[in-house]
């Protein structure tokens, strides 16, 4: 059975209750996930002979099976639908493509000297979290100025505990140097508290207090102290001016504006926290051309907040479909009232107008870039004799220093440009690879990548299968990759491979391109497609080097406690919290160590012996 017949057969067993339904295609892939207040009534709509959009008609014709989950309420169905859409990525659903976590600023409190840092992920560390910020750039600009204003450390605990003299940041007046006791614990904690107050929106009060202290220091002829306070006041004023403080006191809100053109949409998001605009981000959700702005915005909002806490106020440029249901679902997740509004006048309307303008401008840029990108991909098709313009290009490179901390990197590009959410890092695990063996590293990367891709393909997910694979290297890298793919049962017909080798003088513009069974060739130095391929290769190189540096930094930052058997993350955290640093642990006696939760006498003796064996 297929299409409408499959749907009619499933209707026989459906209850008239809330729930979620899934439609599957020929290969078992999920075509669509939908929710309904009444499953039977909703699904029966698909059996009508006419009145469907092209998208829905095509989806019905491709349907080969269906599955259903009954829920207690329509609100629960909406939340489940959003979660399934994000995880399954069905072809016919609106999909939030760039669904990465947003960064926060963390003032970490589980140390004698609180650290300020950029933070992503689940909130596991003890401390004060401020955000979300729209992007890493907004966080880093704020952190940079906060360092000038509050002199908080940014170094990791392992670096802090190893300091014997102030670092460069203290010399340029960015850190109070608590590591070597140049500031008392009480004064440093006060600085951390002031930074937290600033990020909570109390900057005005803080500026007044510091100004009063500066005047008092000046009158007392303590000019160095007055100068330091003056610099801090200036830094705070700079942050406030660049963060677009809201004059009418919108304390906490997210602002969403949607722009559409030619079947493409852009959703612009502003984050307002503590009365400040903490940045903007533009999103380009995947959807069919016939879908409307209210429909797209509804799906976007529920997916956006699937793993994020919503603020009290959400402003939208136009009401999404089922706005009341979305409001109810978000309130259920947050455990408090959430207001979803489309203001018509006042400051909130002005804020939305600004977001709408940003959305339109971002969409115009995106469409211009897409047109240029399509032309370049058509040129790539011609250069490499492809059947059609590639929609997914994967580019690979390795990075290491004499074989240490070796990492492989994969970047992905397509009609929409670089797909950074699809980038991957491969830590080289094979201990039999000779240090520095680039061919061996590439073999491992390709084996892992395509073994997984083949499993996904069998399961019906072909969206991640590359149309073109580019490798940074010459004929040797190409042959190593071909051998690895052959071991997996893949041929050049299954995976289109090209390796890029720089010329003998390694100058850009003299690259040679190698393909299986064909003579190498060069492209004209001024060809736009050559510049594009160079950009792809350079982006893969940048990504691989960045991954290598991260791995090397993590290795360097390892605590001495990591080397002691019996100390995992929980005990390590307890020891550092109790003694302040690894150096403090190293100086502790057995009896002192036993005072820490989770440390018995045997472990205390082992820890003491580790640091005092010499």
Curated annotation (Swiss-Prot):
Its main location: cytoplasm. GO terms for biological process: nucleotide-excision repair; SOS response. Residues 16-94 form the GIY-YIG domain. Keywords: Cytoplasm, DNA damage, DNA excision, DNA repair, Excision nuclease, SOS response. One of its GO terms (cellular component) is excinuclease repair complex. It comes from the Bacteria. InterPro entries: GIY-YIG_endonuc, GIY-YIG_endonuc_sf, GIY-YIG_UvrC_Cho, Hlx-hairpin-Hlx_DNA-bd_motif, RuvA_2-like, UVR_dom, UVR_dom_sf, UvrABC_protein_C. It is found in: Cytoplasm. Pfam families: GIY-YIG, HHH_5, UVR, UvrC_RNaseH, UvrC_RNaseH_dom. Residues 204-239 form the UVR domain. The keyword DNA damage applies. GO terms for molecular function: DNA binding; excinuclease ABC activity. Interacts with UvrB in an incision complex. NCBIfam families: PRK00558.1-5, uvrC. The UvrABC repair system catalyzes the recognition and processing of DNA lesions. UvrC both incises the 5' and 3' sides of the lesion. The N-terminal half is responsible for the 3' incision and the C-terminal half is responsible for the 5' incision. Belongs to the UvrC family. This is UvrABC system protein C. It comes from Hyphomonas neptunium (strain ATCC 15444).
């Amino acid at each position: 059975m297929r299409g409408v017949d499959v749907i009619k057969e499933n209707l026989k067993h459906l209850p008239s209750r809330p729930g979620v339904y899934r439609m599957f295609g020929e290969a078992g892939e999920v075509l669509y996930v939908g929710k309904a207040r009444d499953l039977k009534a909703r699904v029966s709509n698909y059996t009508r002979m006419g009145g469907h959009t092209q998208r829905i008609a095509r989806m019905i014709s491709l349907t080969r099976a269906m599955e259903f989950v009954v829920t207690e309420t329509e609100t629960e169905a909406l939340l489940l639908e959003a979660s399934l859409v994000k995880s399954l990525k069905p072809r016919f659903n609106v999909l939030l493509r760039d669904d990465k976590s947003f960064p926060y600023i963390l003032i970490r409190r589980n140390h004698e000297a609180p650290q300020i840092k950029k933070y992503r992920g689940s909130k596991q560390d003890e401390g004060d979290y401020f955000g979300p910020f729209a992007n890493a750039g907004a966080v880093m600009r704020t952190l940079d100025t906060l360092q000038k204003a509050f002199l908080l450390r940014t170094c990791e605990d392992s670096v802090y505990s190893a300091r014997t003299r102030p670092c460069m940041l203290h010399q340029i007046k960015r850190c109070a140097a608590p590591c070597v006791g140049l500031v008392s614990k009480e004064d440093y904690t006060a600085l951390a508290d002031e930074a937290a107050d600033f990020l909570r929106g109390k900057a005005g009060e803080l500026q007044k207090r510091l100004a009063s202290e500066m005047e008092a220091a000046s009158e007392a002829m303590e000019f160095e102290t007055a100068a330091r306070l003056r610099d801090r006041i200036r830094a705070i004023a700079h942050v406030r001016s660049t963060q677009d403080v809201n004059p009418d006191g919108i304390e906490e809100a997210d602002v969403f504006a949607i722009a559409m053109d030619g079947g493409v949409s852009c959703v612009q998001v502003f984050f307002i926290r503590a009365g400040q605009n903490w940045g903007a981000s533009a999103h380009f959700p995947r959807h069919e051309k016939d879908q409307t702005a209210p429909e797209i915005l509804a799906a976007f909002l529920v997916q956006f907040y699937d793993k994020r806490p919503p603020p009290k106020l959400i402003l939208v440029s136009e009401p999404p479909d089922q706005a009341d249901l979305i409001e109810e679902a978000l309130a259920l997740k947050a455990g408090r009232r959430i207001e979803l509004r489309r203001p018509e006048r006042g400051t909130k309307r002005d804020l939305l107008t600004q977001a709408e303008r940003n959305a339109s401008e971002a969409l115009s840029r995106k469409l211009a870039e897409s047109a240029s990108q399509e032309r370049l991909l058509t040129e790539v098709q011609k250069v490499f004799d492809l059947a059609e313009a590639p929609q997914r290009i994967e580019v690979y490179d390795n990075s290491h220093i004499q074989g240490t901390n070796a990492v492989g990197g994969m970047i992905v590009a397509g009609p929409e440009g670089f797909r950074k959410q699809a980038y991957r890092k491969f830590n080289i695990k094979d201990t039999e690879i000779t240090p520095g063996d680039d061919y061996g590293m590439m073999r491992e990367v390709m084996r892992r990548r395509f073994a997984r891709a083949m499993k996904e393909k069998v399961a019906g997910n072909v969206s991640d299968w590359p149309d073109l694979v580019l490798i940074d290297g010459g004929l040797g890298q190409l042959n190593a990759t071909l051998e690895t793919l052959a071991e997996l049962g893949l041929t050049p017909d299954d995976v289109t491979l090209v390796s890029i080798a720089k010329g003998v003088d390694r100058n850009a513009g003299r690259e040679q391109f190698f393909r299986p069974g064909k003579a190498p060739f060069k492209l004209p130095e001024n060809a736009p497609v050559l510049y594009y391929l160079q950009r792809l290769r350079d982006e893969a190189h940048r990504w691989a080097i960045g991954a290598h540096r991260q791995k090397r930094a993590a290795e360097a930052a390892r605590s001495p406690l990591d080397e002691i058997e019996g100390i995992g993350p929980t005990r390590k955290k307890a020891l550092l919290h109790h003694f302040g640093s690894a150096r403090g642990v190293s100086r502790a006696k057995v009896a002192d160590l036993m005072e820490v939760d989770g440390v018995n006498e045997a472990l205390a003796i082992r820890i003491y012996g580790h640091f005092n064996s010499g």
